[in-house]
């Protein structure tokens, strides 16, 4: 889908660049495939802020998206493509041959009327699901499982994909968008194709108010705060913080490694950080 620009009737319209969503379905979602969703304003179950600068925003209905695709060898027809306010990608409503409906992540080049299917050995075409071990080397995939039967976790954002680059016994080697190469079990499934809406990276929000509609509040820098509020706060006049950048809790930021999951290090063949050196 193309990008859409607007006449400069206001400063916000002048800067605004949006994705043209005119080809998407304009009605309401299927009710049985939706749930109510409470806005938590960045607070956790104890009421403490866990994500700063969240709050407000338009009310959203959660669409239940099927990331597992466990209905094997039953063809499904794509009924329509829809906008989903809870994610950057578009979603597709599919209807199985037995009448059941489901939402899936819409891959690029998936059109209304196409047929998709999940199975051990299926055609390599967008929207079909099969185990990674049965795919040819070089296949572009998304919604990749990391644990057998858990459902897709990797490459679910707009325009993202991973690529199958090799095999190693029961495992396959997958290259991610970040440059990381990783071992994933061959029985883990993935959906063929890249995720829809690749132009999402090119949009321009246009004005502060549109960011508020998305549920983000103004982001305050530490150097404009008082010393009680942030390690960079205080000083007479404008200062640069006087130290290497830290979080509000005094931990180094801007590049310090925070990964602590050592048990899965053996599955990472090439780190995403190695690529940048």
From Swiss-Prot:
GO terms for biological process: cytoplasmic translation. The keyword Ribosomal protein applies. Keywords: Ribonucleoprotein, Ribosomal protein, RNA-binding, rRNA-binding. GO terms for cellular component: large ribosomal subunit. InterPro entries: NA-bd_OB-fold, Rib_uL2_dom2, Ribosomal_uL2, Ribosomal_uL2_bac/org-type, Ribosomal_uL2_C, Ribosomal_uL2_CS, Ribosomal_uL2_dom3, Ribosomal_uL2_RNA-bd_dom. It comes from the Bacteria. Residues 226-277 are annotated as: Disordered. PROSITE patterns: RIBOSOMAL_L2 (PS00467). One of its GO terms (molecular function) is rRNA binding. SMART domains: Ribosomal_L2, Ribosomal_L2_C. Gene3D superfamilies: 2.30.30.30, Nucleic acid-binding proteins (2.40.50.140), Ribosomal protein L2, domain 3 (4.10.950.10). Pfam families: Ribosomal_L2, Ribosomal_L2_C. One of the primary rRNA binding proteins. Required for association of the 30S and 50S subunits to form the 70S ribosome, for tRNA binding and peptide bond formation. It has been suggested to have peptidyltransferase activity; this is somewhat controversial. Makes several contacts with the 16S rRNA in the 70S ribosome. Part of the 50S ribosomal subunit. Forms a bridge to the 30S subunit in the 70S ribosome. Belongs to the universal ribosomal protein uL2 family. This is Large ribosomal subunit protein uL2. It comes from Rhodopseudomonas palustris (strain BisA53). The gene is rplB.
């Amino acid at each position: 889908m193309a990008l859409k620009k607007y006449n400069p009737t206001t400063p916000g319209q002048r800067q605004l660049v949006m994705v043209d969503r005119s080809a998407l379905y304009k009605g309401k979602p299927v009710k049985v495939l939706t749930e109510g969703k409470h806005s938590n304003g960045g607070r956790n179950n104890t009421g403490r802020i866990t994500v700063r600068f969240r709050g407000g925003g338009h009310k959203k209905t959660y669409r239940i998206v099927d990331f597992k695709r466990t209905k094997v060898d039953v063809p499904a027809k794509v009924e329509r493509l829809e906008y989903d306010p809870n994610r950057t990608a578009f979603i597709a409503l599919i209807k199985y041959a037995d009448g059941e409906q489901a939402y899936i992540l819409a891959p690029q080049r998936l059109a209304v009327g196409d047929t998709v299917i999940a199975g051990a050995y299926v055609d390599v075409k967008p929207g079909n699901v099969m185990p990674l071990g049965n795919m040819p080397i070089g296949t572009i995939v998304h919604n990749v499982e990391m644990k057998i039967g858990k459902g897709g976790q990797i490459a679910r954002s707009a325009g993202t994909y991973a690529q199958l680059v090799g095999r190693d016994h029961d495992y396959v080697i997958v290259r991610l968008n970040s440059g990381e190469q990783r071992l994933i079990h061959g029985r883990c499934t993935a959906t063929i194709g890249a995720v829809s809406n690749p132009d999402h990276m090119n949009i321009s929000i246009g004005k502060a108010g549109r960011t508020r509609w998305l549920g983000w509040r103004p982001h305050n820098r530490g150097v404009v705060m008082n010393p009680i509020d942030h390690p960079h706060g205080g000083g007479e006049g404008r200062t640069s913080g006087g130290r290497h950048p830290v979080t509000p809790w005094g931990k180094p930021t801007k590049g310090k490694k925070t990964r602590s999951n050592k048990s899965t290090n053996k599955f990472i063949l090439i780190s995403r950080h190695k690529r940048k050196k």
